[in-house]
Curated annotation (Swiss-Prot):
The keyword RNA-binding applies. Coiled coil: none annotated. GO terms for biological process: trans-translation. Required for rescue of stalled ribosomes mediated by trans-translation. Binds to transfer-messenger RNA (tmRNA), required for stable association of tmRNA with ribosomes. tmRNA and SmpB together mimic tRNA shape, replacing the anticodon stem-loop with SmpB. tmRNA is encoded by the ssrA gene; the 2 termini fold to resemble tRNA(Ala) and it encodes a 'tag peptide', a short internal open reading frame. During trans-translation Ala-aminoacylated tmRNA acts like a tRNA, entering the A-site of stalled ribosomes, displacing the stalled mRNA. Its main location: cytoplasm. This is SsrA-binding protein. One of its GO terms (cellular component) is cytosol. CDD domains: SmpB.
Length: 141
């Protein structure tokens, strides 16, 4: 695993996970493989039946200054058409959000795991903290 999104589990109740490819240009692959990227504030939107990851930061590759892309450009995700339609339906009807959870290598290709989630309220976050603390205390005794 190269990069993970720790904020996603705290801010969302993650329900369903999907593995998808990502369309990258030039030196972005090298930059991501050196973990010079951030998906903490990224999210996925479906625009014109294409899944796009927005607000994902990929730092410029230092050695490849002539071929660098915009660090915050929109990147296309590679999903099957049925998966895109299903995600689009759930986002519209149940008011869910699609967030990236991690980036990793699989068979020499970069993959992104995205999750379908519902946003947590402040009281839900507090309940999770209480449950986690209680479980930690019971393990100690």
């Amino acid at each position: 695993m190269i990069v993970s999104n720790k904020h996603a589990r705290r801010n969302y109740e993650l329900l369903d996970f999907f593995e998808c490819g990502i369309v990258l240009k030039g030196t972005e692959v090298k930059s991501i493989s050196r973990a010079n990227c951030s998906i903490n504030e990224a999210y996925v939107q479906i625009i014109k039946n294409q899944a796009l990851i927005l607000n994902m930061h990929v730092a410029n590759f230092f050695e490849g200054n002539n071929f660098n892309q915009d660090p915050y450009r929109n990147r296309k995700l590679l999903l099957h058409k049925k998966e895109i339609i299903r995600l689009q339906h759930l986002v519209k009807t149940q008011h869910m959000t699609i967030v990236p959870t991690k980036i990793y290598w699989k068979n020499n290709k970069l993959k992104i795991e995205i999750a379908l989630g519902k946003g947590k309220q402040l009281h839900d976050k507090r309940e999770d903290i209480k449950k986690r603390d209680l479980a930690r205390e019971t393990r100690l005794f």
